[in-house]
């Protein structure tokens, strides 16, 4: 039996039972039911029960379980039951957090899944790649991700990168020629394979295999063995937690020794030391960070910024330079044709006349040398090309009539290096090669010009006048395309794109987005340098940049050629003044990113084309366009803009800053609270006072405060002044000297009121003292959640601006009251009944740290004014 690559195009179509016209919707639905979704099976994930069991694998939990078992055999059954209950509740909470974070990340993956262009019911449409079926006719273009294995049936200079399969990074030239003998995958040039990237050209392909039956599906198991990597912040916190664990274990050894010295039994001393370790080591740090990041990415996704990599969330807060495309990102990407230069004069589109020969050549070039289409009134393809089709319709013509009669013979697709595209059509027995692109790419290739009186040789005066008109249009912020043609029987290649007849210029307007000016102003106020990078003419780009505030007095605009002439040293000297880059190449983009990075900046770069991928990868934050972006650019990016809008980048930066700030505040809350417990225990141990807490107290506090209040802090909304602050220094970690001082200071403050409560309780009995210390520490930490919401006071922030914090506080307080005042709970948690006066005194003491911290914040705010 022959392999797919050994069959001819017609044999492949026959075997699949389809035609080159594509499947019907009914056929596609039937085949989808038969073959299943076009997806790769992922490695089996842990079940919820397995995640739950993994919560008990922590060393501290294992030690605590052993201690609890020993306690049970020594007769302390009630304490053992409570300890096991608290451990189980902790495990349940950890499981819920893990599953929630995992689901959040999974939903983000689905948002960035690729699409494909197929022929269904005789029309070209775009569908999700998972709905591709064997027999589908797929249209591949430069920048597309190949989403299924297929046999090429029409080829237009297709080149594919198959490094994901073969490891070979060079582009492979594809062909329709059948391969008769058996060859390895890398030599199957008449096939395309799922997971490869189209780097050049076009092709029509019939799908032969989908899902796990593709070549990449056969090695999917190996691919799924790769473990997800932790972000730099998570790694930093892991390292910090490990160091802290060593310190706390040393403290626990000291506490164990002092407890023994003060007359506590070996078992109770061990139980207490282990409980202190479990309560003091912030094992919730990792999960809290992941949850806050996941919540942040979900919020960004709702605002049209899909984060592909959690590391991007951390980098967003540090972004100091945004290099943005002009078209579609800063502008509306709604092209409309304005002025047309033909026959030596400027006219409007409604003045085009098919009966005038030069007009007819121009209209044919606009419609035939065009890969976009209009389906049900909706444009499919590049907006610039769509605008050209609309012009054809506006003068009462139907592009489909022309396209049905004339067939494309050959083509050289557009690429960002040549800045032009060419196609060949046979008209009335004569081969016509049609070309459109940038003036500086085409004008010098022209040897003649179409005029009212016919075609004549082009002169230097003609070229000067054409250039003048082009500049005039560009100064008005118009995008200008040049059109030319020739009659020729020679093969159409890059080398034969010459000896053209100039037809005319078509200018289009793509107005700035209404929100772009404000977004640019927000970026500048946030200490971020916005830079425009475009393939348009320098004059056009500068005009648009001035309108939206990117290009200001003293700024410089340079072209790709001018950039090429600069040394790295010259570029480094001028980089901060250059606000507009025009007519740039992919290599230019990489140089721009590197120059800014040499200055110590964190750079965000937008892109939508296949050639943008290297620059997107080089940038700290590569941003791909969700609407106009190629699958190659989306694959290379760490963030995808679903609305292709510059303002969305600024929102994402604000959200990135907010996520980092919330993580920092949550960490402050966890660590300062843990420090309070450690300080209180150490003080009592050193001063030979009774131990202020039972083991079960510390476990309960750990359960109560390390969950809901910390997550609530992570849900804090962005503050109004977030974009008035300078970008964060990426070299500066969370655990700075000032942060550590704040953490220790706040922890000491809470410890002091806890010890005061303990001392007052000792005047009655050790049991009352322990209960009062436990209640004071718990309530003080719950109050402390409001302090850690922000660096601002609660009066400026608004008490009810984060209802999650209010909810976490009341739930925590109710649970504490349940333990303290319900009679059957008291022996379980080793607490005793308190008087109303004692309870009121606890509430007052617990509030004192919050009162002091808020007072200091108010003073600081008044000083800053």
Where in this protein do the model-derived segments appear?
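Conserved cytosolic headpiece of P-type ATPases
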Residues: 1-724, 734-735, 759, 774, ...
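Membrane-water interface at loop-to-transmembrane-helix junctions
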Residues: 729-747, 767-771
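Generic alpha-helical transmembrane segments
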Residues: 705, 750, 771-785
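Internal transmembrane alpha-helical bundles of multi-pass membrane proteins
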Residues: 718, 746-747, 751
């Amino acid at each position: 039996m022959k392999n797919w690559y050994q069959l001819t195009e017609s044999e492949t179509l026959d075997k699949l039972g389809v035609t080159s016209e594509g499947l019907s919707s009914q056929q596609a639905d039937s085949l989808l039911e038969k073959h299943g979704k076009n997806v790769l099976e992922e490695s089996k994930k842990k079940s919820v029960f397995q995640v739950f069991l993994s919560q008990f694998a922590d060393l501290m939990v294992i030690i605590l379980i052993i201690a609890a078992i020993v306690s049970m055999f020594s007769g302390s059954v009630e304490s053992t039951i409570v300890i096991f209950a608290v451990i189980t509740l902790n495990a349940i909470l950890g499981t819920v957090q893990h599953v929630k974070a995992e689901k959040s990340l999974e939903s983000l993956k689905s948002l960035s899944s690729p699409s494909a262009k197929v022929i269904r019911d005789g029309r070209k449409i775009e569908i999700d790649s998972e709905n591709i079926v064997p027999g589908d006719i797929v249209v591949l273009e430069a920048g597309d991700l190949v989403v299924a294995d297929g046999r090429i049936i029409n080829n237009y200079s297709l080149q594919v990168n198959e490094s994901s399969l073969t490891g070979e990074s060079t582009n492979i030239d594809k062909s329709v020629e059948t391969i008769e003998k058996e060859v390895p995958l890398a030599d199957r040039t008449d096939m395309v394979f799922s997971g490869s990237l189209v780097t050049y050209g076009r092709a029509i392909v019939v799908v032969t295999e989908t899902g796990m039956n593709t070549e990449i599906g056969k090695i999917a198991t190996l691919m799924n063995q790769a473990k997800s990597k932790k972000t730099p912040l998570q790694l930093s916190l892991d390292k910090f937690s490990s160091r802290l664990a060593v310190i706390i274990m040393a403290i626990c050894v000291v506490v164990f020794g002092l407890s023994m010295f003060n007359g506590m039994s070996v078992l109770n001393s061990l139980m207490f030391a282990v409980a202190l370790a479990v309560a003091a080591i912030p094992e919730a740090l990792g999960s809290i960070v992941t949850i806050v990041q996941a919540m942040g990415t979900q919020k960004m996704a709702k605002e049209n910024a899909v984060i592909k990599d959690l590391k991007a969330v951390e980098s967003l807060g540090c972004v100091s330079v945004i290099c943005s495309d002009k078209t579609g990102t800063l502008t509306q990407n709604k092209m409309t044709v304005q002025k047309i230069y033909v026959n030596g004069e400027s006219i409007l589109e409604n003045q085009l006349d098919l009966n005038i020969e030069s007009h007819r050549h121009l209209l044919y070039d606009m419609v035939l040398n065009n890969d976009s289409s209009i389906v049900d009134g909706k444009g499919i393809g590049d907006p610039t090309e769509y605008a050209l089709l609309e012009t054809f319709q506006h003068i009462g013509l139907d592009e489909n009539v022309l396209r049905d009669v004339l067939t494309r013979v050959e083509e050289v697709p557009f690429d960002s290096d040549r800045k032009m595209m060419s196609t060949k059509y046979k008209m009335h027995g004569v081969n016509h090669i049609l070309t459109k692109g940038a003036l500086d790419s085409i004008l010098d290739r022209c040897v003649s010009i179409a005029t009212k009186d016919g075609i004549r040789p082009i002169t230097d005066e003609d070229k000067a006048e054409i250039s003048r008109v082009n500049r005039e249009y560009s100064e008005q912020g118009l995008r200008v395309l040049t059109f030319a043609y020739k009659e020729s029987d020679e093969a159409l290649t890059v080398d034969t794109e010459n000896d053209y007849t100039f037809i005319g210029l078509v200018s289009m307007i793509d107005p700035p987005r209404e929100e772009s000016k404000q977004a640019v102003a927000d970026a500048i106020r946030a200490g971020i340098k916005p830079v425009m990078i475009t393939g348009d003419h320098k004059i056009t780009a500068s005009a648009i940049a001035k309108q939206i505030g990117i290009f200001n007095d003293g700024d410089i605009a340079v072209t790709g050629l001018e950039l090429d002439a600069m040394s790295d040293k010259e570029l480094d000297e001028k980089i901060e003044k250059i606000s507009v880059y025009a007519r740039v190449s992919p290599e230019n983009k990489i140089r721009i990113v590197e120059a800014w990075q040499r200055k110590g900046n964190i750079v965000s770069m937008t892109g939508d084309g296949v050639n943008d991928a290297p620059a997107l990868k080089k940038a700290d934050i590569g941003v791909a366009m969700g609407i106009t972006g190629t699958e190659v650019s989306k694959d290379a990016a760490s963030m995808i803009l679903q609305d292709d809008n510059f303002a969305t980048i600024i929102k994402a930066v604000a959200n990135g800053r907010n996520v980092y700030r919330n993580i920092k505040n949550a960490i402050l809350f966890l660590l300062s609270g843990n420090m309070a417990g450690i300080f209180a225990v150490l003080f009592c141990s050193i001063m030979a006072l009774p131990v202020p807490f039972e083991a079960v107290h510390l476990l309960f506090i750990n359960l109560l405060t390390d969950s809901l209040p910390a997550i609530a802090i992570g849900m804090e909304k962005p503050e109004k002044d977030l974009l008035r602050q300078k970008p964060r220094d990426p070299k500066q970690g969370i655990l700075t000297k000032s942060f550590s001082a704040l953490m220790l200071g706040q922890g000491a403050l809470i410890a002091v009121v806890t010890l005061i409560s303990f001392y007052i309780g000792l005047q009655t009995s050790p049991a009352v003292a322990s209960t009062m210390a436990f209640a004071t520490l718990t309530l003080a930490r719950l109050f402390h959640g409001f302090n850690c919401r922000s660096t601002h006071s609660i009066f400026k922030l608004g008490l009810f601006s984060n209802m999650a914090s209010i909810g976490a506080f009341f739930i925590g307080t109710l649970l504490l009251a349940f333990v303290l005042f319900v009679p059957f709970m008291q022996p379980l948690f080793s607490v005793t009944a308190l008087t109303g006066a004692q309870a009121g005194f606890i509430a007052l003491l617990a509030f004192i740290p919050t009162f002091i911290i808020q007072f200091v914040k108010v003073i600081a705010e008044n000083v800053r004014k």
